[in-house]
Structures are given as structure tokens and as C-alpha cells.
UniProtKB/Swiss-Prot annotation:
EC category name: ligase
Domain of life: Bacteria
Cellular compartments annotated: Cytoplasm
Family label: Belongs to the class-II aminoacyl-tRNA synthetase family.
Gene: asnS
Protein name: Asparagine--tRNA ligase
UniProt GO BP: asparaginyl-tRNA aminoacylation
Catalytic activity: tRNA(Asn) + L-asparagine + ATP = L-asparaginyl-tRNA(Asn) + AMP + diphosphate + H(+)
Keyword Iron-sulfur on entry: no
Pfam family, one: tRNA_anti-codon
Subunit structure: Homodimer.
Primary site of residence: cytoplasm
GO molecular-function term, one example from the UniProt record: nucleic acid binding
EC number from the UniProt entry: 6.1.1.22
């Protein structure tokens, strides 16, 4: 017996009149007065379910088929036939229906066929991939991640598995999750009364990583072009639609590169992955356009065909000041632009994706290369219409004396970063990279307004269920 994914049947990949078995779950069951039942079966391989037409002469029709409810798992064997109904080209003329798993109580099943709010679905995150919307998110997320890996592979980059446990704070923000095996009820103490981390598993303070960048720099300074793609963690007590405590980051790092090089890399990568998802996940994107955000497909197509605008931070601030717009957060040189400022630039002024460069040093991290003016660093943000910042990057400071001075200025002990400083001592090179928050990318592509709905099991303040 040939087992076939639903997508292969609906796409016409398999010949009409061929016999196949489809395995999946019941979306709906509809019974006609003529003694025929219509089962909508989905298996997650594509957005649409396949319709199985089940006659009442099957042995288990009355005892089982007529008792099937949303969520039951089945194996249905039958012939592929042309569908007379509108909506799909093919359906299954069933000759056998095997019930694999029943829903215990159809009346209390959390994923009954009525539509649920996104907020409710977060409470049943283990069941929400069974819905149209979260299933579509999962497929889009997969296609985006595979496109990212393809892009970097085709460009000659090596994928680096950066460590999740670290003693370094890349961002210098201090909002990190501590990793410890010490007994919280009986902490070892030094003579001064501080916690004695020498007694801990690693013999020092360790944390979950906020970024793979610093480790990526080490490998870029040997392999020339690398990227990391993995989970990162921020202990930031932010309950917003844009923040997660655990999220995924894409972080390329390139030796012998400057700010302009990675600005071009960011543009090329985004256009590549958006073109890929438009081609691979059209059915899912059409669903998002009809139910979530009508501009999803048009926005992605425009993004792929647009030339990115570029502007210096100083000029961007002047544009905001000259706009006459009364922003919620006042505009002045030196601010870290808020989402409303970023979206004004991308959506109303440039009407295109825009790369803002050369930010004030006081709002950026210690590792960003100091510009000749002594006031700004070679940093960039990519701002996308509809969401604002989607990528942040910089040229890294490759001069040891300047890096040391910057760390001291920001209260970081250079001795704690000796391994990082070694990269400047031994064959230093100009290098640059950026970070892309993967969940923000998925949110942008799907139109889902909250990053909690584009990661399988969101981790947020006061929430680590499942």
C-alpha cells in the first residue's frame, strides 16, 4: 500500500485512479442524506485538508465513521479521483477507513472546530499546531529557516554551533539567565559574604548566552565567513508583542569586511529568503492574507523588488525633526530610535526598507568600531516597513587599544575578555556581522502581530509552561 502525504495528492503528483492511503486527523465530518460522509483530513504537509468521500457500505460506517469527530486520527485508503466540487482538484474515494485514535470527549476537546482566539491558543500551546493558523506558521517558519541555511551555504559560509552556556555578556546589558547547580537554600559563601562561584559546576559565574557573536568572531577570524543560527536568551522583564525570553538568532560574521559589506549581505539575505517563502508557501501566505494581514504577500513582493534606502543616523534624526510629526517619544540626536521613529522612516519617508548607519557610540555596544569623529560607531539597523528594526549589526572594533579603552569606558574589565582580545593580538583583521531575530522575521512574513505566536512554545516572564 502506498502512503501519500496530502500535499502529493492535492498537487496532482499522483495519478488519478491510483490507490493510496492517507494518514492524518479529522478536521471536519459532514454527512449527507444520501448515506455518504465527507471527511476533511489534514496531515500538516500543506495548508488544505483532503476530502475523503466515504460510502455507507463500509463495514465500520455506522459503528465508527459516523462517530468520528474533530481531532480523531485515521488512515483512509481509496482511489484518487477528480473532485466535482470547487476548491480542490482531487479527492479520495474511500474504500477503507481505519480509526487510529479517538478523541476522548468531543465536547471538551480544546481544539473543537469552532474558531479560537490567538490568546486562548497560547494557553494550549501543545495542541495549537492542530489549528490552521499555527500549522501555517510552523510551515513558514520551516521554509524560512531552510532558506537561511541555503543562502549561507551557497555564499560559502560555514555554520557554527555557538555555545549556549557562556561567561561573556555580549551586549553588556546584564539581563542574563544564570546557569548554576548551587543549592539555593544553602549557598556557599566567601569570607566577604558573596556567593562563592568557585564551588559551582564551572568554577565561575556562567549564563545562558544572549548572542553567539563573540564566539562567531573567533571562527570568522579563521574560516573567513561563518554564521550561527540558534537559541539565545534574555532575562528582560518585558511583556510586549516583540519580546521573548528565549528566541532564535541568525548571526553571520565576516572577516575582511566593513559596514557596507554586511549592509549588502543583509539586503541579499532578506530578499533571498522572502523570495523562497513566496515560492514554497504560497497556500499558507494566502491564508495569512485572507485572515491575518491582507498586505502580507504584497509586502513581501515589494520587499524583494525594492532597492534598500540608506541613511546616516544623523540625517535620519533630521528627517524626523523636519517631518512635523508629533511622536510619542521626543526626537533628538543621541536617542535610541523607537519603533514609531523606525516605521515612519521606512513606511512614510522612504517607503522602502532602509538601512540606518553610524549610530551614537553611547547607545551601542563596546565591540562596535569607533568612527573617526569619536562620537559614532560603525553600526547599522535594517528597518522594514510594517515592523521597524529587523536586523542590527556593525563593523567590529579590530584595534586592541581602542577596544580596551571602550571596555573601560563602559565599565567592562578587559581582563575578563582576554580570549576576545587575543583575536586582536594575533593577526587582527577588519570584520563585521549582524544579528537577525528569527521570530521577528517570521512575524513579519506571516503578519502575526505577536512573536509569542510564531515560536512553538514561547518563554516569557512568568510563563515557562509545556
Amino acid at each position: 500500500m502506498t502512503y501519500a502525504p496530502v500535499k502529493d495528492v492535492l498537487s496532482g503528483k499522483l495519478a488519478v485512479d491510483s490507490e493510496v492511503t492517507v494518514r492524518g486527523w479529522i478536521r471536519t465530518r459532514r454527512d449527507s442524506k444520501a448515506g455518504i460522509s465527507f471527511l476533511a483530513i489534514y496531515d500538516g504537509s500543506c495548508f488544505d485538508p483532503i476530502q475523503a468521500v466515504v460510502p455507507n457500505n463500509l463495514n465500520n460506517y455506522n459503528d465508527e465513521v459516523l462517530k468520528l469527530t474533530t481531532g480523531c486520527s485515521v488512515e483512509v485508503t481509496g482511489k484518487i479521483v477528480a473532485s466535482p466540487a470547487a476548491g480542490q482538484a482531487f479527492e479520495l474515494a474511500a474504500t477503507d477507513v481505519k480509526v487510529v485514535g479517538w478523541v476522548e470527549d468531543a465536547d471538551t476537546y480544546p481544539m473543537a472546530k469552532t474558531r479560537h482566539s490567538i490568546e486562548y491558543l497560547r494557553e494550549v500551546a501543545h495542541l495549537r499546531p492542530r489549528t490552521n493558523v499555527i500549522g501555517a506558521v510552523a510551515r513558514v517558519r520551516h521554509s524560512l529557516s531552510q532558506a537561511i541555511h541555503r543562502f549561507y551555504h551557497e555564499q560559502g559560509y560555514y555554520w557554527l554551533s555557538a555555545p549556549l552556556i557562556t561567561a561573556s555578556d555580549c551586549e553588556g546589558a546584564g539581563e542574563m539567565f544564570r546557569v548554576s547547580t548551587l543549592d539555593l537554600a544553602n549557598l556557599p559563601r566567601t569570607e566577604s559574604g558573596d556567593v562563592d562561584f568557585n564551588e559551582d559546576f564551572f568554577g565561575k559565574e556562567t549564563f545562558l548566552t544572549v548572542s553567539g557573536q563573540l564566539n562567531g568572531e573567533a571562527y570568522a577570524c579563521a574560516l573567513s565567513k561563518i554564521y550561527t543560527f540558534g537559541p539565545t536568551f534574555r532575562a528582560e522583564n518585558s511583556n510586549t508583542s516583540r519580546h521573548l525570553a528565549e528566541f532564535w538568532m541568525v548571526e553571520p560574521e565576516v572577516a575582511f569586511a566593513d559596514l557596507n559589506d554586511i549592509a549588502k549581505l543583509a539586503e541579499d539575505m532578506l530578499k533571498y529568503v522572502f523570495a523562497a517563502v513566496l515560492e514554497e508557501r504560497r497556500d499558507d501566505l494566502e491564508f495569512f492574507a485572507s485572515r491575518i494581514d491582507k498586505d502580507v504577500i504584497n509586502r513581501l513582493e515589494q520587499f524583494v523588488s525594492s532597492d534598500f534606502a540608506q541613511v546616516d543616523y544623523t540625517d535620519a534624526i533630521q528627517i524626523l525633526l523636519d517631518s512635523g510629526r508629533e511622536f510619542e517619544f521626543p526626537v533628538e540626536w543621541g536617542i535610541d530610535m523607537s519603533s514609531e521613529h523606525e516605521r515612519f522612516l521606512a513606511e512614510e519617508h522612504f517607503k522602502a526598507p532602509v538601512i540606518v548607519k553610524n549610530y551614537p557610540k553611547d547607545i551601542k555596544a563596546f565591540y562596535m568600531r569607533m568612527n573617526e569623529d569619536g562620537k559614532t560607531v560603525a553600526a547599522m539597523d535594517v528597518l522594514a516597513p510594517g515592523i521597524g528594526e529587523i536586523i542590527g549589526g556593525s563593523q567590529r572594533e579590530e584595534r586592541l587599544d581602542v577596544l580596551d579603552a571602550r571596555m573601560v569606558e563602559m565599565g567592562i574589565d578587559p581582563e575578563h575578555m582576554n580570549w576576545y582580545r587575543d583575536l586582536r593580538r594575533y593577526g587582527t583583521v577588519p570584520h563585521a556581522g549582524f544579528g537577525l531575530g528569527f521570530e521577528r522575521l517570521v512575524s513579519y512574513v506571516t503578519g502575526m502581530g505577536n512573536v509569542r505566536d510564531v515560536i512553538p512554545f514561547p518563554r516569557t516572564p512568568r510563563n515557562a509552561n509545556f
